[in-house]
Amino acid sequence: MDETRYRDPIDRLVEPGERVLAHAKADVGQGLAPAPPPEPESTVAPGWRTVGSVLLNVLLPLATWDRGDRLVDAIGWGIAGRGAPGSAASRLHRALRPPRPDLQVRETLLAVTDRRLLVCRTGGVKLLAGREAEERALAETSVAWSATRAEIASARVGWHRLNPKRLRIDFTDGSWLSFTVPIADSGRPLREVAAALSA
């Protein structure tokens, strides 16, 4: 994996005078995630109930069971993060995993500057797209979420299950979220991000 190809898009996103100390391509850790932030109040007035809406309210809980999904995540993957609804980890997780994804492949990039932590997303690419689509997606990289350095309590890389390359970022509000890379990829970029956040 060539980490240098991500540096130019990140450099375009920082403010003038802001220095990039470390960056890494990573994925949010699999497993039990922090609770989602509270949803904003709906401004749409309630309408008439239809037979379809009543049936969906009856059948939808049978098709998906949130507690069952969370139990499978906890047993199979462990815990990917913790935090109350609206915490830093909760907002970060929601920024990277929205409730209604567009089903395109996006890369997550972590960048530590002398002022903040940037969590960036590349543009969307369809599965099995060509090299030109990947370059276009890289050019469409944008900041999905950011936090000042004062909001970061600590960061460290360590073992989780069989993967020795899991970055855990702890926030000052007590929440935390993990990021991983595939076992075949180098853990050096994650260690550099952890060192830059801890400095």
Annotate each language-model stretch with its function.
Residues 1-23, 165, 172-199:
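Terminal and domain-flanking low-complexity segments
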Residues 39-40, 137, 195-198:
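Short, charged/polar low-complexity linear motifs in solvent-exposed/disordered segments
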